[in-house]
């Protein structure tokens, strides 16, 4: 099993010393060739769980009262910082919900992509640049050579999101964590990006998609989990069966709302 989350609690300590429980007793598994859709409304805890997989939550204020996050048999929560840096990017790629907060404002887009590639792959600068431009094209960015010379603030939100997606996918990691990956994208580019992610999991990688969009889940997921108020309330190994007959009242409400929006 590539990813095995066991009895995970994620909590945050406020400035006043209060403890807020973001996720409680979460158990999830994800193997190579699978796509897990983790769905729920804002504040349900899904992003806290997903970011814990690569231990990306700031600590403090985040902490883990109990549980394990096993990635390829090793507990991420017990890894040293050098061990974490070795797997982030190369073995675990992350598409963040807020791209502008994840890209350096001081460096050009192309330079950031090249740096990421050369940090994890033993290739020349020229080869890394060619690879970066190729991936900018793959995620639907026109004139990749021109855009590569831009700074993040010179790109639209949708363009920034596509850069983040290229950065996460280009090293073909074992696991991709995508937090609302298509929110800022138009329908055409969204389809293009989802196709790239499908190709990746078919190449024996795993994908964890965090979203409130059940349409994305229906297109992508091979299994899904529904979160509400920090807890997993329903899981399904057959998404089609889930959409046909969700069991938990909250899941039923989500599916009803998705159908209503389709009709609108």
Locations of regions flagged by a protein language model:
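Conserved ABC transporter NBD signature motif
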Residues: 64-75, 234
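Conserved ABC ATPase signature
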Residues: 150-155, 159
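A short, surface-exposed alpha-helical micro-motif characterized by mixed small hydrophobic
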Residues: 217-219
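A short, proline-enriched helix->beta-strand linker immediately N-terminal to the Walker B motif
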Residues: 170-174
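Helical segment within the ABC ATPase nucleotide-binding domain
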Residues: 191-203
């Amino acid at each position: 099993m590539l990813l095995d989350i066991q009895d995970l609690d994620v909590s945050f300590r406020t400035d006043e010393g209060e403890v807020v429980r973001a996720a409680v007793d979460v158990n999830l598994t994800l193997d190579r060739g699978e796509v897990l859709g983790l769905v729920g409304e804002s504040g349900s805890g899904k992003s806290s769980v997903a970011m814990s997989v690569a231990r990306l939550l700031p600590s403090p204020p985040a902490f883990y009262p109990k549980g394990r996050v096993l990635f390829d048999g090793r507990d991420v929560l017990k890894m040293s910082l050098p061990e974490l840096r070795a797997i982030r990017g190369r073995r675990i790629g992350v598409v963040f919900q807020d791209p502008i907060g994840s890209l350096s404002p001081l460096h050009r887009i192309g330079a950031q992509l090249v740096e990421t590639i050369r940090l994890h792959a033993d290739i020349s600068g020229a080869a890394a640049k060619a690879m970066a431009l190729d991936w900018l094209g793959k995620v639907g960015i026109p004139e990749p050579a021109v855009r590569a010379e831009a700074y993040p603030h010179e790109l639209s939100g949708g363009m920034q999101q596509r850069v983040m997606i290229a950065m996460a996918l280009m090293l073909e990691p074992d696991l991709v964590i995508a937090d609302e990956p298509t929110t800022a994208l138009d329908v055409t580019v969204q389809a293009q990006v989802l196709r790239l992610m499908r190709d990746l999991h078919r190449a024996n990688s795993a994908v964890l998609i965090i979203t409130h969009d059940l349409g994305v889940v229906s297109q992508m997921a091979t299994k899904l989990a529904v979160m509400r108020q920090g807890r997993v309330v329903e899981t399904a190994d057959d998404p089609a069966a889930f959409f046909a007959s969700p069991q938990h009242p909250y899941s039923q409400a989500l599916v009803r709302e998705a159908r209503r929006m389709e009709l609108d």
